[in-house]
């Protein structure tokens, strides 16, 4: 059986004991799930959680001799991932993906490697198994020597259109439970893909992703996933929703409360945009009653001039109004700022 190793790429060059905030690599988990469905032996090495150095990873690949490796890349660890790929001494097909790829793939095409390098722009859980099995019908949009660029957009047959039916086998994430700052055992989920907003600083901005549709999971699929989590980890106390669109309007707030009404043993935390609450301010109390413990808001700046420059919708007054309502209703608030 062919061996595929997926790497959650490191954020430091060397082994470190720094206690950075940790989130499970859910995207790699989805890819691993569908590689297994295709009959491919797959494992995930979480270089962040295991605190592996860049040299450790390259040596590990050369020692293990996998047939395929896949690794995600971010703007801040570009040079680290480049070093890993260029340090592979064995023959193996490589896959590289992540939100940043669409902006840097021309640079990746210049990397010095003799191995086949599949550069995936977009979501990879369907196209990667097809490439491994030699069954991919999609023609690469760019090619240089042994490097191939595949774009998975809404026109691709490998685009996950209905994400309510995309399954995640959480076994591949290992011990994904984290202790949040309330001392609760917590697991993270994603309930949407794509974004309806167009912030100038974000790689997921709508204007940069016109070829990708925003997709929302059904209430039933989210309930089913939480049931599966509790079946596997009955001592879980909190769910963290990582995407921005779980609380996107009044109707979705009602849906959130209905979902967690099924799980009275759980609290939950999630992201929310100021615009989602400013028009539904009366529903903030409902969120507290639905055991929402903490909300995360991208404030970015209190300067109206700067907010306009970065296309951050909602005014500073909106931020103040929403923040005050959240706190007065007993929900904790975490604000993100850009410096």
Please provide the spans of the model-predicted regions:
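Glycine-rich beta-alpha loop elements in corrinoid/cobalamin-binding modules
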Residues: 31-159, 165
